[in-house]
């Protein structure tokens, strides 16, 4: 596309050089800038990428978007604008022909449950033989092909490219986990959502948002982003068991479908039966009551299942067809995931990293604990510490508790575990400043019949250490290695 055409939608401040050049890519990553691409510089929290403008010029890039004039060779065109990342959204969506308009786009937001609901929607679509894409905490996936990602919601240009990649691969729908950070930072500008889903709102990320009011407002931006064009068929799916849903009803003109277990809703679950092999319930809908069986464990996952089913149903698939698909869904990685059922202990990993998420996790597993419940939880560094003692209190619902850091970054690991211990309600706990050692200890003290829960990370494949260096780490692999060493078994008979 000719750059002059591309920039017609942008009210630029100043252009230094010529826009008569062909553009086939846009990037905010200086390492990928080249001839034919636009490099968009920005001022981030830790890095001002304007300092890389000379580097991208050396790589052959002839067009940069900046917030102030840079000292660059005359053959490099500079487009000066007040808000470079806002302009990046406009340019990316225009250059790649508005990819989110070319498929059905589901957006899932909430403190807990985003990954589960988004993954369930993707898996249901696959069971229905539909080409589907997923983007979120567990990476980027088109049908069964997976790649890892760095953020739940990538920056705006990367996100647009992922949607374009899904479209080019023939995806009929794409499900996005929508983080509050991504909404506030404008990473989702220009994405055309068709269905917006809300799971819940509990305390988290106050280190970024400051107050619960600001955090709630951030979540509401997804529903505002649906727009006001009632000629389009768009829908909202809200959890009536969370009172914040009432506010979200007020920020969108589109039809709302509510679900709930404890509070009255259009879609409800009754006659719930739970086990470590899954759940069953009666799905009470405006069109009748349907028996549902699911391989997902825990009452909270019933809420997630309902949200996913309603979202897919809203776009035209019958409930009967969806319910049949739900019975045979694969596990959501790292979400109440039981590792190797052949072990004499129940070894479970989960992503729960808030007091509310941990409460629901313990509620789900406690009825099936045969002997002791051993619970390991971590606190992340450089995060809101006001939630930490409450996490420690909830963890002490277990018989034995292990406090560890989780992505300590530049914080003192001992300080993080001490903050968790402030909430302890019994003395049956221990602190480890090395999470891997804490996991090994959990297995070491476990006896046949015990349940060991490793919370806070799921299958996250790293620990963020001082200097924000990512060090390889997998709770599941460390736990399984220790369990096979103690109890025997394993894929190679350790």
UniProtKB/Swiss-Prot annotation:
Q: What is its main location?
A: cytoplasm
Entry GO MF terms: ATP binding; magnesium ion binding; UDP-N-acetylmuramoyl-L-alanyl-D-glutamate-L-lysine ligase activity
Residue numbers carrying N6-carboxylysine:
219
Q: Which UniProt keywords apply?
A: ATP-binding, Cell cycle, Cell division, Cell shape, Cell wall biogenesis/degradation, Cytoplasm, Ligase, Nucleotide-binding, Peptidoglycan synthesis
| Name of the coding gene | murE
Detail which positions bind ATP: 110-116
Task: Name its pathway.
Answer: Cell wall biogenesis; peptidoglycan biosynthesis
Q: How is it modified after translation?
A: Carboxylation is probably crucial for Mg(2+) binding and, consequently, for the gamma-phosphate positioning of ATP.
One GO BP on record is: peptidoglycan biosynthetic process
Q: Where in the cell is it found?
A: Cytoplasm
InterPro entries in the cross-refs = Mur-like_cat_sf, Mur_ligase_C, Mur_ligase_C_dom_sf, Mur_ligase_cen, MurE/MurF_N, UDP-N-AcMur-Glu-dNH2Pim_ligase
What family is this protein classified in?
Answer: Belongs to the MurCDEF family. MurE subfamily.
Q: GO CC terms for this protein?
A: cytoplasm
Record motif L-lysine recognition motif, residues: 406-409
Spell out the protein name for this chain. UDP-N-acetylmuramoyl-L-alanyl-D-glutamate--L-lysine ligase
**What is the taxonomic lineage of the source species?**
Bacteria, Bacillati, Bacillota, Bacilli, Bacillales
**Is Ligase found in the keyword set?**
yes
Native organism is Staphylococcus aureus (strain bovine RF122 / ET3-1)
């Amino acid at each position: 596309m000719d750059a002059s055409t591309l920039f017609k939608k942008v009210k630029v401040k100043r252009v230094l050089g010529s826009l008569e050049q062909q553009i086939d890519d846009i990037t905010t990553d200086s390492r990928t800038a080249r001839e034919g691409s636009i490099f968009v510089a920005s001022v981030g929290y830790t890095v001002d990428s304007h300092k890389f403008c000379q580097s991208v010029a050396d790589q052959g890039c002839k067009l940069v978007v900046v917030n102030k004039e840079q000292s660059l060779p005359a053959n490099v065109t500079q487009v000066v604008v007040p808000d470079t990342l806002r302009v990046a959204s406009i340019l990316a969506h225009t250059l790649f022909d508005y990819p989110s308009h070319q498929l059905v786009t589901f957006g899932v937001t909430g403190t807990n449950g985003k990954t589960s609901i988004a993954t369930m929607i993707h898996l249901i679509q696959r069971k229905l033989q539909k080409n589907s894409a997923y983007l979120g905490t567990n990476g980027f996936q088109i049908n069964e092909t997976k790649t890892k990602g760095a953020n739940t919601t990538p920056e705006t240009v990367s996100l647009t490219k992922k949607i374009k990649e899904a479209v080019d691969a023939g995806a009929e729908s794409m499900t996005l986990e929508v983080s509050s950070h991504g909404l506030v930072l404008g990473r989702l500008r220009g994405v055309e959502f068709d269905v917006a889903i809300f799971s819940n709102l509990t305390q988290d990320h106050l280190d970024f948002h400051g107050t619960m009011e600001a955090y709630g407002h951030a979540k509401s931006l997804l529903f505002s982003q649906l727009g006001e064009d009632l000629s389009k068929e768009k829908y909202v799916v809200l959890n009536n068991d969370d009172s914040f849903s009432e506010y979200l009803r007020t920020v969108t003109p589109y039809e709302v479908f509510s679900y709930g277990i404890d509070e009255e809703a259009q879609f409800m679950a009754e006659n719930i039966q739970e086990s470590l092999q899954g759940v069953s319930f009666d799905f009470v809908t405006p069109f009748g009551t349907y028996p549902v069986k699911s391989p997902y464990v825990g009452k909270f996952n019933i809420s997630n299942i309902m949200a996913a089913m309603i979202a897919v149903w809203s776009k035209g698939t019958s409930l009967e067809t969806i319910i049949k698909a739900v019975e045979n869904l694969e596990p959501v990685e790292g979400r109440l995931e039981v590792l190797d059922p052949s072990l004499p202990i129940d070894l479970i990993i989960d992503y729960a990293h808030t007091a509310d998420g941990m409460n629901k996790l313990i509620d789900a597993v406690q009825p099936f604990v045969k002997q002791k419940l051993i619970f390991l939880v971590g606190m992340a560094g450089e995060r809101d510490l006001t939630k930490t003692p409450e996490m420690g209190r909830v963890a002490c619902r277990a018989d034995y508790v292990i406090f560890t850091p989780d992505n300590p970054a530049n914080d003192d690991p001992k300080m993080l575990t001490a903050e968790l211990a402030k909430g302890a309600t019994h003395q049956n706990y221990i602190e480890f400043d090395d999470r891997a050692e804490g996991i090994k200890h959990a297995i070491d003290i476990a006896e046949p019949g015990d349940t060991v829960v490793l919370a806070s990370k799921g299958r996250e494949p790293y620990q963020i250490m001082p200097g924000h260096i990512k060090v390889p780490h997998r709770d599941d692999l460390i736990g399984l290695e220790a369990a096979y060493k103690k109890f025997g078994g394993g894929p190679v008979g350790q």
